[in-house]
């Protein structure tokens, strides 16, 4: 059974709020950057970047991070993993980086992203923005900006659909029946 958590309009309002939360903590200058974790994290970062520009009139640095080779579960993901480009067209040293992803679960994706990011320099600070924090952490990782805290059972699946990738915007929870 699939349960709708947020529709497209609600997801857009969530991203508006997150953009305002980022602006409450940061000046928009060349020391702040949004870096999206592939795949859906890049679209979230782009949307936050656009919303911040609409509010402030200022551009935010933007990058895309592929963590495939940094995953500790690489052999479980695919026999032949598909690598996508990492595109961080600026020096991250001394910058505040806001990593963006769709769902925060065990923390392992973020651990991999931190390892990958360290190959590009030494930021002064790294923060985390996620659309959904579903709990069940296996590592001591906490998001700085959260669209929705959604306590789940480990057997449930959170689906975030973004129109750039999935053709529509929504957050749904797949609840498995105990039949």
Curated annotation (Swiss-Prot):
Keyword list, A-Z: Glycosyltransferase, Transcription, Transcription regulation, Transferase
Family statement: Belongs to the purine/pyrimidine phosphoribosyltransferase family. PyrR subfamily.
A Pfam family annotated for this UniProt entry: Pribosyltran
Record motif PRPP-binding, residues: 97-109
Enzyme class: transferase
InterPro entries: PRibTrfase_dom (IPR000836), PRTase-like (IPR029057), PyrR (IPR023050), PyrR_bifunctional (IPR050137)
Its biological purpose: Regulates the transcription of the pyrimidine nucleotide (pyr) operon in response to exogenous pyrimidines.
Gene name of the record: pyrR
Any one Gene Ontology BP term: regulation of DNA-templated transcription
Enzyme Commission numbers on file: 2.4.2.9
Catalytic activity: UMP + diphosphate = 5-phospho-alpha-D-ribose 1-diphosphate + uracil
Protein name listed in UniProt: Bifunctional protein PyrR
One annotated GO molecular function: uracil phosphoribosyltransferase activity
SUPFAM superfamilies on file: PRTase-like
Taxonomic source organism: Elusimicrobium minutum (strain Pei191)
